């Protein structure tokens, strides 16, 4: 039975639909909708249900659904107003999961939809300080299956990949989802969801007062429109109510979210209605239509992988599902996303970093940025990823004193199966750009400069063949009375792939300024901005579980950190769609610091059929 998100079901059809989705697959990255349920190719449930013990299932209000398995039960619901505590992002996400009979704090599709989030866990969690909601939940009834001895159908088990095959794993998830529906709650809900943004200074008590005020305002009872709550549970169609308000020909059971901001955008309200017939009328008018047009307001799930105990390949599917739920790439790009979810490592590896100086200072070129300032020595050794795609870069201050500048590359531990990289011997770096504007002093114009010319592939293969950075090194050249720092890159090619999309890191205006003017403008803009001492820094949510997620710590804090930005520049799985590679880079000077920016690209592998 097909179901469109904006189709209004009558009471009997809604009950039949609630029964029919029990045991179907579900993609937890989706909002709770009937349309997101998944069947087997022949339209069957994913789990085995005994067809020999069927009976008529009676619902509240006298609705009867025929030929329902005895393992499927129905319980009467209740009418409840719930106002949550003021919770953090992870606490609220965990609460939503618990309401769906799930554990953990990974945001679900329903959670993201209710609070109008972007599906990027770290960014969403970093953008808000607290979350809360206040609303009416009209549960007419709930339908559940007995979970004892719940078993997947053999045809579903046979499709579980026995190895890490990204295409097969992505196909399984797209076909069957990530979970199995074991419970459905039908009725309606009218809820205000509140997001306190990170920049807000309101205390939790103030947020609670605002929430109560907005809730009382939205859910107030108009004595003229007030109806008996008993009509909500009667389950009998009362068409006179719909006709009286002109709701019969129009209206939907699922309305779009209404998003409202406070004046300074510190607080956001997301108002959502599900079930009933919603034409933007008052809460009281909407309330009396819920029994005539109920919709799904909640579901309970069990993970598909929990029903695969002992089956070969369960671990691979479980890992793929966890990655999909954590980072939520578009389902149509899940194949490419999974291919790139290999361990990432830095070259050189942490254990290879020198504890002392590898070479004498005389053999390392140096840069001087002021008359009395320290020298910055430059490690000009070539860093090679071994024909493996580079996904990030960083500067690192090596040596016992932390005064040797080196470049490091983050790369995949292996090359994805769909890529076939080979080094391009025809590529030759551009020696020196003609435009003088690319040579930028770090402090004063009479001392060392940095070449900020973008380094990209310009080899003999000028077609759409994909070029990926696999090597990098630094070089120092004398130009007149000054020394200039250059970035050099080496590239590998894949003739079977093309570049689909490319973009650079955000470049600040300071990176285009030079010398004294950069320092002056930076100080002026700093004076006009809020005092850093009184401004609370925005905390970044890091879901990276690596031993050194922010890079190895030097033995001592180098003095030259005031001249070098050692921040890691990379795009990981949390950056949609999660399989970016580095295809270019450039040096920058920002606020008196040498930094590096990367150019990222998405690749598309061309099938052999399309090449014929």
UniProtKB/Swiss-Prot annotation:
Pfam families (alphabetical): MACPF
InterPro entries: CAD1/NSL1-like (IPR044663), MACPF (IPR020864)
Example of a GO biological process term: regulation of salicylic acid mediated signaling pathway
Keywords, ordered alphabetically: Hypersensitive response, Immunity, Innate immunity, Plant defense
Coiled-coil residue spans: none
Family: Belongs to the complement C6/C7/C8/C9 (TC 1.C.39) family.
PANTHER family with a match to the protein in the record: MACPF DOMAIN-CONTAINING PROTEIN CAD1, MACPF DOMAIN-CONTAINING PROTEIN NSL1
Name of the protein in question: MACPF domain-containing protein NSL1
Source organism of this protein record: Arabidopsis thaliana
């Amino acid at each position: 039975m097909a179901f469109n998100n904006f189709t209004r079901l009558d009471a009997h059809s809604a009950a039949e639909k609630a029964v029919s989705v029990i045991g179907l697959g579900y993609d937890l990255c989706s909002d709770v909708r009937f349309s997101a349920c998944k069947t087997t190719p022949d339209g069957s449930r994913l789990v085995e249900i005994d067809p020999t013990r069927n009976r008529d299932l009676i619902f509240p209000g006298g609705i009867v659904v025929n030929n329902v398995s005895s393992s499927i039960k129905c319980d009467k619901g209740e009418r409840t107003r719930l106002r949550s505590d003021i919770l953090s992002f992870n606490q609220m996400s965990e609460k939503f999961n618990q309401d769906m009979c799930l554990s953990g704090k990974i945001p679900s599709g329903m959670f993201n939809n209710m609070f109008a989030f972007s599906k990027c866990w770290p960014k969403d969690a970093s953008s808000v300080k607290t979350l809360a909601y206040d609303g009416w939940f009209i549960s007419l009834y709930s339908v559940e299956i007995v979970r004892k001895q719940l078993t997947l159908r053999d045809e579903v088990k046979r499709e579980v990949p026995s190895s890490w095959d990204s295409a097969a794993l992505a196909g399984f998830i797209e076909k069957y989802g990530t979970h199995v529906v074991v419970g459905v709650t039908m009725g309606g809900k009218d809820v205000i969801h509140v997001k306190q943004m990170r920049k807000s200074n309101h205390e939790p008590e103030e947020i609670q007062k605002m929430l109560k005020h907005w809730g009382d305002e939205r859910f107030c009872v108009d004595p003229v429109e007030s109806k008996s709550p008993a009509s909500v549970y009667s389950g009998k169609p009362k068409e006179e109510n719909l006709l009286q308000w002109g709701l019969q020909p129009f209206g939907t059971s699922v309305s779009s979210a209404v998003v409202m901001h406070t004046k300074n955008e510190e607080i956001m309200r997301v108002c959502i209605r599900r079930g009933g017939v919603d034409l933007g009328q008052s809460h009281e008018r909407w309330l009396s239509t819920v029994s005539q047009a109920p919709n799904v307001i909640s579901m309970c799930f069990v993970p598909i992988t929990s029903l695969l105990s002992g089956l070969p390949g369960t671990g691979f599917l479980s890992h793929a599902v966890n990655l999909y739920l954590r980072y939520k790439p578009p389902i149509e790009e899940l194949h490419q996303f999974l291919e790139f979810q290999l361990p990432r490592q830095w070259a050189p590896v942490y254990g290879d970093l020198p504890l002392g100086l590898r070479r004498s200072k005389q053999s390392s070129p140096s840069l001087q940025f002021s008359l009395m300032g320290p020298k910055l020595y430059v490690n000009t050794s070539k860093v090679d990823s071994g024909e493996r795609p580079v996904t990030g870069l960083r500067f690192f201050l090596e040596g016992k004193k932390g005064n040797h500048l080196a470049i490091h590359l983050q790369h995949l531990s292996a090359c994805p199966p769909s890529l076939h990289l080979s080094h391009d011997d025809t590529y030759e770096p551009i020696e020196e750009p003609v435009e003088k504007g690319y040579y930028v002093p770090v402090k004063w114009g009479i001392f060392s400069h940095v070449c900020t010319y973008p380094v990209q592939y310009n080899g003999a293969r000028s077609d759409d063949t994909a070029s990926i950075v696999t090597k990098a090194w630094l070089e120092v050249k004398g130009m007149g009375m000054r020394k200039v720092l250059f970035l050099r890159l080496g590239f590998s090619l894949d003739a079977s792939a093309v570049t689909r999309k490319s973009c650079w890191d955000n470049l600040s205006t300071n990176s285009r300024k030079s010398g004294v003017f950069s320092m002056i403008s930076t100080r002026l803009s700093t004076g006009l901005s809020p005092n850093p001492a009184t401004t609370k820094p925005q905390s970044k949510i890091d879901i990276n579980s690596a031993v050194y997620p922010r890079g190895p710590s030097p033995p001592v804090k180098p003095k030259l950190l005031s001249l070098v930005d050692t921040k890691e520049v990379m795009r990981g799985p949390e950056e949609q769609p999660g399989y970016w590679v580095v295809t270019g880079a450039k040096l920058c000077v920002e606020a008196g610091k040498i930094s590096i920016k990367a150019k990222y690209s998405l690749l598309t592998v061309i099938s052999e059929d399309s090449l014929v």
